[in-house]
From Swiss-Prot:
Positions of the record's site feature: Lowers pKa of active site Cys: 137
All residue ranges annotated as the BPL/LPL catalytic domain in the record: 24-212
Family classification: Belongs to the LipB family.
Protein name: Octanoyltransferase
Active site per UniProt: 171
């Protein structure tokens, strides 16, 4: 399996094309990247959770796309670290539950190691929240398991300004419940981003086979 870190923003539609090719050939790969301001609706989206008209989004330069991942509406924007994980569960004989639990555990352990920040999950509302204030969400998750090959993944709010979230009720919740490392007053510099990615690689390798690393 490869890990690829993109330093440039990747258009959301380009990612959708990439993940379809990866699934077609069942080619495992983990991607770290950022998107330009984008809103996506998952297979369980509620139209009422889109708070503005598509015409307004277009005028603000915000793209909107409908996807086959789980969940409702979420937002992507510069400064948010996105981790897309493409894993062949059938080949690895892994259950969906095991995969999800360990994906979230990898993020929890990595964030704790990087900032000494404690996060918790919520079985009733997927994602990761502050242990000190469970109403505050810092990480979204949405995964597609078509043909037992995963795509999509997690979006962690690092230094993004959260403005795009104001256009939606993220996963059915008020956008004011969203937070970021920057908003919490922690160091969000490039070196901390790199440290987080390094920790994520290590923790992902704890439940997946060794990964070959490349950059783009």
């Amino acid at each position: 399996m490869k890990i690829i870190e993109f330093r440039k923003k990747i258009p959301y539609l380009r990612y959708l094309e990439m993940q379809e090719k990866l699934r077609k050939f069942r080619k495992e790969c983990i991607l770290f990247l950022e998107h330009a301001p984008t809103i996506t609706g998952g297979i369980n989206y509620n139209p009422e959770n889109l708070l503005v008209k598509p015409e307004f989004l277009e005028s603000m330069g915000i793209q909107i796309h409908w996807t086959q991942r789980g969940g409702d509406f979420t937002a992507h924007e510069p400064g948010q670290l996105v981790l897309y994980s493409h894993v062949d569960l059938k080949k690895r004989n892994l259950s969906i539950r095991f995969y999800l639990e360990n994906l979230l555990r990898s993020v929890i352990d990595s964030v704790r190691s990087t900032w000494d920040l404690q996060l918790i999950s919520d079985s009733d509302s997927p994602g990761l929240y502050l242990e000190s204030n469970p109403s505050q969400k810092i990480c979204s998750i949405g995964v597609n398991f078509k043909s037992f090959f995963t795509s999509h993944g997690i979006a962690f709010n690092l230094s993004n300004d959260l403005k795009t979230f104001r256009c939606i009720n993220p996963c059915g919740r008020n956008w004011t419940n969203m937070t970021s490392v920057k908003d919490l007053g922690f160091d969000f510099g490039l070196h901390k981003r790199d440290e987080l990615i390094s920790c994520l690689k290590k923790n992902l390798c704890s439940f997946l086979e060794p990964i070959n690393v490349s950059s783009s």
